[in-house]
Amino acid sequence: NDKVSLGNQPTGVPGLDTLLGGGLSEFSFNLIAGAPGTGKTTLAHQIMFALAGPHKKALFFTVLGEPPLKMLRYQQQYSFFDIDKVGSCIRYVNLAENLRTGDFSGVLERISKEVESFAPGLVFVDSFRSVIQTARSGNEGISDLQHFVQELGTRMTSWQATTFLIGEYAPAEAEAN
């Protein structure tokens, strides 16, 4: 039998695995999207803290203007938050400065370098919408963004990690896309 068997990976979020038919496919590429303030980042953190451990590390890239420290302070209010995992099996990387220059290839290289050095089983990119807005207003245009998305998708699937893109969308935009 030459078929590769990919298992279902429970999310660790009460009730979510039932909705997903048992969990997420291992090494899957996932999108967490919704309107502002709907809990996308909190859901991502709940999954990350439930699954991350010594044998499955997590890398959380943030491209938001706020520093990871501010986000960590907010997430600490939840019972799933475990400060002992931060640094050892969960690492935060702020890409805001890389993105500010508008150089998508530089952002890709930074992401790849961090993934290669930390070898995570889980990768999160929050917020993907910030990358799109940079394409619309910066030096690089929509075709550069499309190349970035394709290249990021290709690299993410080759990392043998379950990956998540987190995107903020207004309801009208979500329906249009």
Predicted regions located by residue number:
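Short boundary/hinge segments that flank catalytic cores
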Residues: 5-7
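P-loop NTPase motor core
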Residues: 30, 100-177
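Conserved ATPase "switch" residues in P-loop NTPase domains
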Residues: 24, 52, 153-157
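Pre-Walker A adenine-sensing motif
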Residues: 11-23
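Charged, amphipathic alpha-helical linker segments immediately N-terminal to NTP-binding catalytic cores
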Residues: 1-3
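Conserved P-loop
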Residues: 30, 35-99
